[in-house]
């Protein structure tokens, strides 16, 4: 609403608005027979509804700081977004992954992503990160894993970085 009305806003205010709008969804988190509800009951994974309830805390806590770090290191938007995706894979409880491969697959994927992120070259060297992501993609394909939840969060991150006034900074090279 704030953007449609061309009101000044920032990400913390939008995140708070999202939390307020979604507050009524909390009782629904573990109800129903959807995969997301089942994974919430079994593993405490909040899925898309839980992410919205939190005002997209995964973006605030992980994706946006990762974008800032990688962009500052390289001034390369594509590289920064790849770094964000890897960061999301490491920290998001992606229920798409769990649906395809079980909680063990999520543990494996998060471990692989964290291993890649632990290499300093991942943040500073676009070629090294791209090669690591290609390898990880091939492994996920072999295991029939879909990282759709993390991809959705990446899409929201891309949208947010198109509106630097929302984040209080510009991410484009000077």
Model-predicted regions and their roles:
Residues 1-138, 142, 161-174:
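Phosphate-rich cofactor/ligand-interacting catalytic cores and adjacent structured alpha/beta frameworks
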Residues 143-158:
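Conserved phosphate/anionic-ligand binding catalytic regions in large, soluble enzymes, centered on
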């Amino acid at each position: 609403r704030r953007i449609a009305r061309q009101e000044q806003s920032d990400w913390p205010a939008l995140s708070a608005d999202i939390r307020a709008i979604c507050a009524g969804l909390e009782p629904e988190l573990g109800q129903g027979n959807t995969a997301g509800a089942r994974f919430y009951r079994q593993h405490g994974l909040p899925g898309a509804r839980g992410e919205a309830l939190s005002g997209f805390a995964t973006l605030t806590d992980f994706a946006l700081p990762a974008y800032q770090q990688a962009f500052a290191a390289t001034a390369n938007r594509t590289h920064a977004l790849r770094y964000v995706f890897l960061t999301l894979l490491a920290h998001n409880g992606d229920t798409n992954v769990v649906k395809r491969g079980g909680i063990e697959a999520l543990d494996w994927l998060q471990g692989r992503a964290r291993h890649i992120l632990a290499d300093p070259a991942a943040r500073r060297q676009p070629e090294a990160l791209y090669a690591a992501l290609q390898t990880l993609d091939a492994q996920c394909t072999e295991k029939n894993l879909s990282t759709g939840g993390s991809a959705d969060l990446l899409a929201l991150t891309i949208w947010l970085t198109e509106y630097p006034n929302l984040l209080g900074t510009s991410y484009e090279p000077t």
